[in-house]
């Protein structure tokens, strides 16, 4: 759930 996406 982060930016850049990954979680």
UniProtKB/Swiss-Prot annotation:
Keyword line: Cell wall, Secreted
Principal location class: secreted
Compartment list: Secreted, Cell wall
Annotated GO CC locations: extracellular region
Designated name of the protein: 22 kDa cell wall protein
Native species: Solanum lycopersicum
Higher taxonomy: Eukaryota, Viridiplantae, Streptophyta, Embryophyta, Tracheophyta
């Amino acid at each position: 759930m982060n930016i850049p996406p990954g979680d």
